[in-house]
Regions:
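Pyridoxal 5′-phosphate
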Residues: 1-133
């Protein structure tokens, strides 16, 4: 694996910060995108944008199909049993809140323990902290 070659796919890493190469360590919050993703997002917003699952007009149906086809692609990529196991969230914080709330409401009981390390990102500490109250 050639890290330099992979890094060249990400336009953000062409930027310099005070004459130094950019180092980005907050991908759990916001992931940098390779150019191919930026181009595809731009194409979607320029030519295909519509709400997903909210209407029956052409653009809405096309956007919904694209969304569901993406769910199927992810299912195959991670070898999930069913495409409905795939849940898209806006980021790690929303995903961790969702997991904590589902486990808290449906599975965890008084006396159960959830172990996390002191090294956890704040987004993984807060949902469990609130859950214990």
């Amino acid at each position: 694996m050639n890290i330099d070659k992979i890094k060249k796919e990400f336009p953000i890493f062409d930027e310099k910060i005070q004459n130094n190469d950019l180092v980005y360590l907050d991908s759990a919050n916001s992931s940098q995108k390779p150019k191919v993703v930026i181009d595809r997002i731009n194409e979607f917003y320029s030519k295909e944008f519509s709400n997903v699952g909210r209407s029956v007009h052409y653009l809405a149906v096309a956007a919904t199909n694209l969304y569901e086809n993406t769910r199927t692609s992810v299912q195959k990529f991670i070898n999930a049993k069913d495409k409905n196991e795939i849940v898209f969230t806006k980021g790690a914080t929303e995903a961790l809140n969702l997991v904590a709330n589902i486990l808290g409401q449906n599975y965890l009981q008084d006396g159960d323990e959830v172990l996390i390390t002191e090294l956890e990102h704040h987004s993984n500490y807060v949902p469990w902290h609130f859950l214990r109250k």
